[in-house]
Regions:
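Small-residue-rich hydrophobic transmembrane alpha-helices
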Residues: 54-114, 151-170, 263, 283-341, ...
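Residue-level signal for short hydrophobic patches within transmembrane helices
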Residues: 17-36, 40, 63-70, 146, ...
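Short runs within selected transmembrane alpha-helices of multi-pass transporters and secretion channels
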Residues: 75, 144-162, 170-178, 199-214, ...
């Protein structure tokens, strides 16, 4: 009697374009909604409180980025290891990975809330608060830290739920949180006159709703099971999860480091321009939040390819892995060019959404957008390439790309060029870093495919 045929996984057989579309759209929308919490706060605070209130939300924003960085390290690392294990038919190891992740998330969430509460004053000073915005920044930060564990749960569990084959569920969770936040913001800010405190409370309530709904899904997992016996983490598996997730973590954590560095440079060198330190800080923070919407699209495409690449690499379908990368890189390039056009053509219109009727603020919007985003049309390629290496279990190459862009090029150049050219020098570091990371990405991926051909993996 012939053995029963194994049911084929869609990751191995379905059209690549359909798979990327299925996984990327919910993922991108999920991340967009995460960032929209802060953008909605900024819009309502800008209209209801003004530039000082906007500066306060900008100062606290790196906390959100750090939280999402931890979430992506744990969630993406778990999802990548799960996909590799499932591709190799290692079901028990996939179950262990998912179970470990729950414990890691709880521990990280408790740490974020407690540390954020205890060191709120130091965090606000480190993140570049001006003297006039200090108290508002502190009030806002002391509240939002209690929503960070739920932001962590929702951001990390989306990767696991996506790898489980249900990306639409994550989108529903995030939309619920965003709707709650958007409804409560005007009530607390305008109706109850609570200012930035009201914005923070609305954000936390929305994050609790979204994170709670994601936690409920753990009982509905299809491809893996959470087992109580495997909740206690082991060093080996935890290290493997972190190893696979560290590129996602560093991409986000370096984004936070860039923003903290630039916040301080905007405060210092912006004060020497006609814009002033508070306006420069507020506008830069707004630009970074709008940038995060574009960034979410790239993460959506990149994250969508991770389970495809991981499963097919584990199944030795190397032609399919290469085809997936090519399609992801093409999509990323098109999206990059589109956002570049928006940033260059409509900077004042974007600024008007946040603060209207202030010509100095709008002049700063136009200048910062056009200089800081000068090479943004190249941006998406480095993210698609880093995700490709992460998906096939090569974290060193995946890590090198974001590390070089931000830690080796952008931050040092911003510090050096600002000393030589002031305000504009700090802004010019970003387009230079985009060009360098684009060239590095091409070099690494071409070398990888040449290696595959030499080993006979590609037809």
């Amino acid at each position: 009697m012939e053995p029963p045929q194994r049911k084929q996984n869609p990751l191995e057989t379905a059209p690549i374009g359909r798979l990327i579309r299925r996984y990327s759209i919910p993922t991108a929308l999920t991340l967009m909604v995460n960032y929209l919490y802060n953008i909605v706060d900024q819009i309502f605070v800008g209209q209801g409180v003004g530039v000082t209130g906007m500066a306060a939300t900008n100062v606290a924003f790196p906390l959100t980025i750090v939280t999402i960085a931890l979430a992506l390290m744990i969630g993406d690392g778990c999802a990548a290891n799960m996909s590799l294990c499932l591709g190799r038919r290692q079901q028990e190891e996939a179950d262990r990975t998912a179970s470990h992740t729950v414990t890691l998330l709880v521990a990280a969430g408790v740490f974020l809330a407690v540390a954020g509460s205890l060191f709120a004053r130091q965090i606000v000073l480190l993140f570049g608060a001006t003297e006039t915005a200090f108290q508002a920044s502190l009030d806002y930060t002391r509240i939002i830290v209690w929503g960070l564990p739920f932001l962590l749960f929702s951001s990390a569990l989306t990767a696991i739920i996506r790898a489980d084959g249900n990306p639409k569920y994550t989108m529903k969770c995030m939309i619920l949180g965003a709707v709650i936040n958007t409804v409560l913001d005007p009530v607390f800010i305008f109706g109850l006159h609570m200012g930035v405190v009201g914005a923070a409370i609305a954000t936390v309530i929305g994050q609790v709703a979204a994170g709670g709904l994601c936690l409920v899904y753990l009982r509905r997992l299809q491809s893996v099971r959470i087992r109580r016996a495997w909740l206690r983490p082991t060093a080996a598996l935890t290290g493997r999860i972190f190893k696979l997730g560290i590129p996602s973590f560093l991409t986000q954590i370096m984004t936070a480091a860039v923003q903290v560095t630039m916040n301080n440079l905007m405060t210092r060198y912006g004060a020497q321009t006609a814009y002033g330190g508070d306006v420069a800080l507020s506008v830069y923070g707004m630009v970074m939040k709008v940038y995060q919407i574009a960034h979410a699209m790239f993460v959506g495409v990149s994250s969508a390819t991770q389970p495809i690449n991981g499963y097919n690499f584990g199944a030795k379908r190397y032609d399919r892995v290469r085809a997936t990368y090519r399609m992801a890189a093409t999509i990323a390039l098109v999206v990059s060019v589109g956002w570049f056009a928006v940033y260059q053509l409509f900077p004042r219109a974007i600024g008007t959404l946040f603060v209207s009727g202030d010509p100095v603020y709008l002049d700063a919007c136009q200048h910062i957008f056009r200089v800081y985003m000068l090479a943004f049309f190249l941006y998406g390629i480095h993210m698609a390439t880093s995700s490709f290496f992460q998906g096939i279990g090569r974290p060193v190459q995946a890590l090198a790309i974001p590390l070089v862009r931000q830690a080796v090029v952008l931050i040092p150049l911003a510090l050096l060029l600002s000393q030589a050219f002031g305000f504009n020098g700090a802004l010019l570091a970003a387009p230079i870093a985009d060009v360098v990371s684009f060239l590095l990405s091409l070099a690494l991926v071409l070398r990888e495919f040449r290696r595959w051909k030499k080993q006979g993996w590609l037809s």
